[in-house]
């Protein structure tokens, strides 16, 4: 399983509501994709500009397919990425 945590920071506080709406929409679509084990989006209660994505994919292939899918290419990439600073952290789940 591949685990990915993505830290997002809104560049402009005026875009927080828009980012939140786009991330919610992308999350719902991503959860329906083959190989998606977990896909959650969190909005910080203490840092309003901060969002955290937690993704678990069955395989690298599933993640690669996600990056070709609608949620990533029609919502996340064009509508969210230009509005945020982004830091991805691939990780291994400890057992």
Roles of regions detected by a PLM:
Residues 1-32, 36-37, 41:
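N-terminal first-folded block
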Residues 2-8, 40-67:
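Short, well-ordered beta-strand segments in beta-rich or mixed alpha/beta enzyme
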Residues 15, 49, 72:
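Short phosphate-engaging motifs
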Residues 2, 41-49, 75-95:
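Glycine-rich beta-strand-turn "strand-cap" elements at beta-sheet edges
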Residues 10, 15, 24, 53, ...:
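Localized chelating/binding microdomains
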Residues 25, 29-34, 56-89:
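An amphipathic, aromatic/His-enriched active-site/gating alpha helix that lines ligand/cofactor pockets
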């Amino acid at each position: 399983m591949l685990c990915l945590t993505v830290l997002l920071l809104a560049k402009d506080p005026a875009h927080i509501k828009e980012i939140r709406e786009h991330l919610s929409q992308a999350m719902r679509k991503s959860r329906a994709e083959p190989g998606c084990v977990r896909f959650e989006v969190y909005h910080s209660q203490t840092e309003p500009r901060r969002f955290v994505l937690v993704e678990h994919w069955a395989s690298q292939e599933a993640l690669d397919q996600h990056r070709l899918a609608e949620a990533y290419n029609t919502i996340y990439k064009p509508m969210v990425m230009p509005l945020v600073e982004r830091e991805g952290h691939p990780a291994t789940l400890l057992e």
